């Protein structure tokens, strides 16, 4: 599966806006906030953001895949990365390269 960079940015922005302090953002709440992406795209993106240490997630492996239950937090590195890609005009320049 291909990593959708716009989905990556949007997941981080939505997580930042909707994650409560000392709480989590369930996948069931995240999906409706990102209507432009499929469940598979969002799940894959969350797994890759976790792999890159930008998000901490709660996940459950099952035969044939992994289920993402919740986003637990944006890591410090995730916040730093998000600050670098937050500006829409800068983001457009980055993804055009």
Protein language model regions, located:
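Non-catalytic, well-ordered alpha-helical scaffold segments
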Residues: 5-9, 40-43, 52, 72, ...
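Generic structural signal for hydrophobic core residues of well-folded globular domains
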Residues: 15-18, 49, 82-85
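Short amphipathic alpha-helical interaction segments
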Residues: 35-57, 68-69
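Amphipathic alpha-helical interaction segments
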Residues: 22, 53-57, 85-89
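Glycine-/proline-rich flexible loop or hinge segments
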Residues: 29, 58-59
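Short, amphipathic alpha-helical interaction segments positioned at domain boundaries
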Residues: 66-97
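Solvent-exposed edge beta-strands and adjacent loop segments
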Residues: 60-65
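Short amphipathic alpha-helical interface segments
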Residues: 2-34
């Amino acid at each position: 599966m291909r990593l959708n960079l716009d989905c990556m940015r949007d997941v981080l922005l939505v997580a930042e806006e909707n994650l409560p302090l000392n709480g989590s953002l369930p996948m069931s709440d995240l999906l409706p906030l990102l209507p432009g992406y499929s469940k598979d795209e969002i799940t894959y993106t969350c797994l890759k953001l976790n792999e890159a240490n930008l998000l901490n997630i709660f996940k459950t492996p099952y035969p044939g895949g992994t289920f993402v239950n919740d986003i637990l937090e944006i890591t410090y590195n995730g916040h730093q990365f998000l600050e670098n890609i937050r500006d829409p005009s800068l983001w457009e320049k980055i993804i055009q390269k």
